[in-house]
């Protein structure tokens, strides 16, 4: 068996937490091959999952195994940003969502290059490492071009098989048509602009926008902060007839999937500047929601489908026009979001037009969304994605024969 050390935000309620659990769950499908030990790390200020079902108990078991084990490992898998990558074992695999802008920091490339394999969530995440114009200064003062050289696999998230909770009574909405957006409130998600443009487009109509958000955590102080931020935006529109609904706090998987299927929540809208993948977008897509989003970054992997015999993929969402421009000064984060990087800016009139089309042509847009849902359950099933993860790892794993069980033709009786 291969002793695997997994360092990841396994218990974090975050995108990287989801990614970590995806990797561990995939490894766990091959218990005859992988002996798993987990070190769950924090992920910023995000809370930990509060579900104490059988999966959480299993993750706790893998954590206890690691604490009690003092030996070495054959393979390490690290789900985090590249500057935190280290060589914990003879073979090391980095797993990351990359960056939401058009390029990663040079330090990310340097650290990724020490990995034996990189697994990224999307083609956009991979592209951020592949730019040819990256320069670094050597200790002797020389400027040298930095090229990405790590072997890389692009593996998307799988669909989740969750029994959605009926939220029609728990979340009472007065309007029959409501848009939904799920976003942590920060520079990248562009929430303030979305609220403004929604109000301006539907100012005199009884239409709603359900905003599931937080700033950092899911505590009462965070809720009050988000409430104040929403009030600041809507204060400029005192006579509006449309409605903004703020949802805040922890929601279970069953509740979140119930939100996507709420009978009065019809469509999903985002004006994000960029996504490494876009998990809420993905969940909305495989739940059959019509979607409007900028046609740029990680979510393009799953919002378009391939058609047999055709080179170009078919767009299955309402594409919002955009410009690619430098990130805002306040969004720059040295070593993560470099000030010379760029991401997309949804155009105001295109966003309003996309929302109007989802509202006016709902029946046709819903039909397209159902076709996308059907396709995603075929291409992104848990079995398919978990096999992709396992196969990618076994390509670099030490002395691993993934087919050893199938090659046994006879068991001797002694």
What is each of the regions a protein language model found here?
Residues 215, 323-414:
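C-terminal amphipathic helix plus adjacent low-complexity
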Residues 1-73, 387-390, 414:
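N-terminal pre-catalytic "stem/leader" segment of glycosyltransferase-like enzymes
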Residues 258-276, 286-289:
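Acidic donor-binding loop of glycosyltransferase active sites
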Residues 117-164:
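Donor nucleotide-sugar binding/catalytic pocket of nucleotide-sugar-dependent glycosyltransferases
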Residues 5, 45-131:
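Extended catalytic core of nucleotide-activated donor transferases of GT-like folds
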């Amino acid at each position: 068996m291969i002793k695997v050390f997994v360092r990841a935000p396994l218990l974090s309620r975050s995108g990287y937490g989801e990614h970590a659990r995806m990797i561990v769950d995939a490894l766990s499908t091959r218990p005859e091959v992988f002996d798993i030990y987990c070190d769950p790390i924090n992920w910023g200020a995000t809370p930990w999952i509060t579900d104490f079902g059988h999966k959480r108990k299993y993750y706790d078991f893998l954590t206890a195994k690691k604490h009690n084990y003092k030996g070495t490992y054959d393979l390490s898998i690290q789900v985090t940003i590249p500057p935190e990558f280290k060589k914990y074992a003879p073979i090391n695999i980095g797993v990351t969502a990359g960056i939401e802008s058009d390029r990663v920091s040079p330090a990310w490339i340097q650290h990724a290059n020490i990995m034996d394999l990189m697994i990224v969530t999307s083609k956009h995440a991979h592209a951020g490492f592949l730019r040819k114009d990256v320069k670094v200064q050597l200790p002797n003062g020389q400027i040298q071009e930095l090229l990405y050289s790590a072997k890389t696999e692009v593996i998307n998230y799988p669909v989740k098989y969750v029994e959605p909770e009926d939220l029609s009574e728990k979340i009472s909405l007065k309007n029959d048509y409501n848009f939904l957006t799920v976003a942590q409130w920060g520079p990248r998600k562009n929430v303030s602009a979305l609220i403004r443009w929604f109000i301006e487009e539907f100012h005199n109509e009884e239409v709603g926008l359900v905003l599931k958000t937080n700033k950092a955590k899911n505590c009462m102080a965070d809720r009050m902060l988000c409430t104040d931020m929403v009030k600041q935006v809507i204060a400029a529109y005192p006579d509006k007839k449309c409605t903004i609904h703020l949802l805040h706090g922890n929601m279970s998987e069953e509740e979140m999937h119930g939100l996507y299927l709420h009978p009065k929540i019809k469509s999903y809208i985002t004006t994000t500047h960029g996504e490494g993948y876009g998990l809420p977008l993905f969940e909305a897509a495989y739940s059959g929601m019509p979607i409007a989003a900028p046609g740029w970054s990680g979510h393009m992997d799953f919002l378009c489908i391939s058609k047999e015999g055709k080179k170009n993929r078919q767009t299955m969402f309402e594409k919002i026009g955009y410009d690619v421009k430098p990130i805002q000064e306040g969004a720059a984060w040295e070593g993560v979001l470099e000030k010379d990087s760029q991401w997309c800016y949804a155009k105001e009139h295109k966003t309003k037009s996309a929302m109007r089309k989802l509202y006016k042509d709902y029946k046709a847009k819903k039909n397209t969304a159902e076709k996308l849902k059907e396709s995603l359950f075929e291409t992104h099933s848990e079995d398919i994605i978990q096999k992709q993860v396992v196969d990618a790892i076994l390509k670099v794993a030490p002395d691993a024969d993934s087919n050893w069980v199938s090659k046994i033709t006879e068991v001797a009786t002694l």
